[in-house]
A protein has these predicted regions:
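A mid-to-C-terminal "edge-of-domain" accessory segment
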Residues: 2-39, 293-473, 509-512
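Short beta-alpha connecting loops at secondary-structure transitions
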Residues: 209-211, 239, 267-275, 287-299, ...
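Catalytic alpha/beta core domains of metabolic enzymes, predominantly
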Residues: 216-351
Length: 553
């Protein structure tokens, strides 16, 4: 049985809050991004990546545009060590990319880390120790003073070994479990580390404040970051970094509000992979900025390709509703949504506006490698006439008359409902043609001839009706009127033509014409037919006969 009384809030609000960050509307520039896919992401996989897979993933991150990439914890295992050496010895690290390695604040681990870095042109050495109340009391059984000494001893050793090792080394410190640490104590630990390192304008250090486990609402984390930023020593020479996880589902919100509160840098992963519920998803963060007109400095212009590579290398699946990247994130099944999108697309084609503003689509799918035809309007039993007509128009060139769209919509939706499945564009085309186009039962057109008379047009129609040859004659003001009068003269049917429309089929055809006819019975019912033929006159006759044949059904 659930019992909320066993829980209490485990986070710490700052002793003072200015909330200056709440006055900012949006993030105006991209932070420094650091991918931790090859460490945090990899350690969370059921089957960690092999050496070759890691190398491929590293190249993938470089292609996306990451300039800082955490490549592992080289002292943790031979695999991690070998991967780092492979990158260095095979010169796989571009000059504009800085690798990052993780180490605990323990002497033998730090020494092993620097051994692994020999030959690296430039690297961030990321040292951490846990500072939270729970970790101090339950795991390490150490006092605040003892935990601070672990941090400062690690910082001193880092500085000494960096001086003794060839290469350009930058330092990063994380008070792990920061959000479960008393804020002023976390500040004291970070300032003590900074006093050891003495950062300068030409040699800045990184202080990383992780949401190791989410404990609060996002505004609390933002207030913590703002307090740390305002009270931290050497602030102008410190890169203030974030490392949010997603335990409460607020990883993106934590990050965005903390950036408003003064942070400069973000550590995260593609698609939010990571321990438990994952790290913050950098793709979502970057594209959220992009939709506000801010260049995220990362290239996500081919998300389908990136998704396939990620799923293959990690053996993980991207959730269908994952923001921006999921298979269904642009899909509209609802009839009203489809209608609004279709009208928005037509409006954009007509007006050519400078900025993107389409209902239900916060980003242009083309910008991230998606297609309107296959990704946006999706048809099932919940769809509407606008969406179905949009699919037929965009994929196959059918400009269905407005009054006919409702009938076609109900027909297609009924098929989807009976099959209990989504209909792809080719399924929709098949239904449309089978129900409306060139219907030849019971009447099948063989030939039609017209003669211009002073009194109008005379038509001679050669048909097969239920397999029996027939020859009908009729007069009218125009060709279609003459054919209609001939059909009614030789049958018991009574109707009037209420809609006629024609156009060239310019998608996937050889100069064919398409016509649509709606006929209304005396009781007010309207039945629709369509005809397709190389000759527009024949197409219009076929459309009329299709509609008349459907009256008999």
């Amino acid at each position: 049985m659930m019992n909320p009384s066993k829980y209490e809030r485990q986070y710490f609000m700052p002793p003072e809050t200015s909330l200056d960050w709440t006055k900012k509307e949006y993030i105006t520039k991209a932070p420094t991004w650091c991918s931790v896919d090859l460490r945090d992401g990899n350690q969370a996989l059921i089957i960690p990546m092999s050496l070759d897979e890691k190398v491929e993933f590293f190249k993938l991150l470089v292609k996306v545009g990451f300039k800082e990439i955490e490549v592992g914890f080289p002292a943790a295992s031979e695999t991690e060590y070998t991967f780092l050496r492979t990158l260095i010895e095979n010169d796989l690290i571009p000059d504009d990319v800085t690798i990052q390695v993780l180490t605990q604040a323990r002497e033998h681990i730090i020494k092993k880390t620097f051994e692994a870095l020999k030959g690296a042109k430039r690297a961030i050495v990321h040292v951490y120790n846990s500072t939270s109340v729970a970790q101090r009391e339950q795991v390490f059984k150490k006092s605040k003073e003892e935990v601070m000494k672990i941090a400062t001893d690690g910082a001193k050793l880092l500085k000494r070994l960096a001086d003794e090792t060839d290469g350009n080394f930058l330092f990063e410190y994380s008070p792990e479990s920061f959000t479960g640490t008393e804020i002023d104590y976390a500040l004291d630990v970070c300032n003590a580390v900074l006093d050891v390192w003495q950062p300068r304008p030409d040699w800045k250090v990184i202080i990383n404040l992780p949401v190791t486990v989410q404990l609060s609402l996002p505004h609390v984390y933002a207030s913590q970051i703002e307090y740390m930023s305002k009270h931290m020593k050497y602030r102008e020479n410190v890169v203030l970094s974030l490392h949010p996880h997603n335990d409460r589902g607020c990883g993106v919100a934590d990050t965005e509000l903390a950036l408003l509160a003064g942070a400069d840098r973000v550590e995260g992963t593609l698609f939010g992979n990571g321990e438990r519920t994952g790290n913050v998803d950098i793709i979502t963060l970057a594209l959220n900025m992009y939709t506000h007109g801010v260049d995220p400095k990362l290239d996500f212009s081919n998300l389908p390709e990136l998704t396939k590579a990620y799923e293959r290398l990690t053996r993980m699946s991207v959730y269908e509703r994952q923001p921006y990247t999921g298979q269904l994130v642009f899909a509209a099944f609802s009839g009203s949504h489809q209608d609004a999108i279709a009208k928005g697309m037509h409006w954009r084609d007509e007006k050519h506006p400078e900025h993107w503003n389409i209902p239900y689509l916060p980003i242009d799918p083309h910008d991230v490698g998606r297609e309107y035809e296959s990704d946006v309007i999706r048809i099932n039993s919940q769809s509407g006439k606008g969406g179905i007509s949009y699919v037929l128009e965009e994929n196959f060139g059918f400009h269905i008359p407005g009054k006919m769209r409702e009938d076609v919509g109900y027909t297609v939706k009924d098929v989807s409902d009976k099959r209990h499945q989504e209909l792809v564009p080719r399924d929709i085309l098949k239904v449309f043609k089978e129900v409306y186009v060139n219907i030849d039962d019971p009447c099948k057109l063989k030939e039609v001839h017209f003669v211009q008379k002073d009194s109008g047009i005379e038509a001679e129609i050669s048909l097969e009706k239920s397999g029996v040859p027939k020859l009908y004659h009729g007069k009218g003001n125009g060709r279609l009127d003459a054919v209609s009068n001939a059909l009614q003269r030789h049958s018991d049917m009574h109707y009037s033509i209420v809609t006629y429309q024609e156009h060239a089929l310019n998608v996937g055809s050889n100069s064919q014409a398409c016509a649509y006819v709606g006929v209304q019975e005396p009781n007010g019912n309207v039945t629709w037919g369509s005809g397709i033929h190389e000759d527009i006159i024949t197409a219009s006759v076929l459309a009329l006969i299709s509609a008349v044949n459907r009256l008999d059904q």
